[in-house]
């Protein structure tokens, strides 16, 4: 190899021109991944907290409104009366015996925008929910509790409002940025499902009016 060629190779090896662009190309995808990741995961945390607060408000409303599900009784009836025994008097606490009050079972339904109670609750909490949420993401459950109510009185179940199948939508292309940053594969999803959230409260009397 001639001295001229050797000199050219050494000069090229010592040349620092363009190194800044190379470093920028390496660092920029990592920076963007961290930056947009902080934004999206911050949004996800905020939406999760707001959804929890929405469930608390929904349960408070559902506890004092007519049932959102069909088939929920309005009054507590007698349970099974054993032969040759005196039926319990109206006004007897349900907790006084296992069969004092009839157990209508647990009644569950999905939120329906056509139901007045579900519609009122959705109008109150929809602003706190992710934009992809609909009334169908709400589930209402009315469960009998023998510690509540008395024979002949208004039915007072434990009311549970649950949000389910709620997805968070990422707005940043985190998968593509991760690939540019050198991450193997691209397994980051565009959506992430929130865990089921629920709040339970004892019903006051499942009032027959609205907005009261």
Residue ranges and their predicted role:
Residues 1-17:
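N-terminal leader/signal peptides at the extreme start of proteins
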Residues 16, 23, 49-57:
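A broad detector of short, well-ordered amphipathic alpha-helices
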Residues 17-30, 40:
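N-terminal signal-anchor/signal peptide hydrophobic helix marking the start
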Residues 40-54, 67:
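Membrane-proximal amphipathic alpha-helices
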């Amino acid at each position: 190899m001639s001295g001229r060629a050797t000199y050219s190779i050494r000069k090229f090896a010592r040349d620092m021109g363009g190194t800044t662009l190379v470093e920028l190309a390496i660092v920029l995808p990592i920076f963007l991944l961290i930056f947009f990741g902080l934004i999206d995961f911050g949004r996800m945390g905020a939406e999760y907290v707001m959804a929890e607060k929405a469930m608390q408000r929904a349960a408070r409303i559902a506890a004092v409104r007519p049932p959102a599900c069909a088939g929920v009784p309005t009054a507590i009836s007698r349970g099974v009366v054993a032969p040759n025994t005196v039926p319990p008097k109206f006004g007897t606490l349900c907790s006084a015996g296992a069969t004092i009050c009839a157990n209508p079972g647990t009644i569950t339904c999905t939120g329906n925008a056509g139901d007045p109670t579900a519609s009122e609750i959705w109008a109150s909490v929809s602003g706190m929910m992710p934009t992809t949420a609909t009334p169908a993401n709400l589930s209402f459950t009315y469960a009998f509790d023998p510690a509540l109510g008395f024979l002949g009185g208004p039915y007072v179940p434990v009311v549970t409002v649950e949000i389910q199948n709620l997805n968070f939508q990422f707005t940043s292309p985190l998968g593509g940025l991760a690939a540019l940053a050198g991450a193997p594969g691209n397994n980051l999803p565009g959506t992430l499902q929130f865990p089921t959230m629920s709040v339970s409260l004892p019903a006051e009397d499942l009032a027959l009016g609205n907005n009261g």
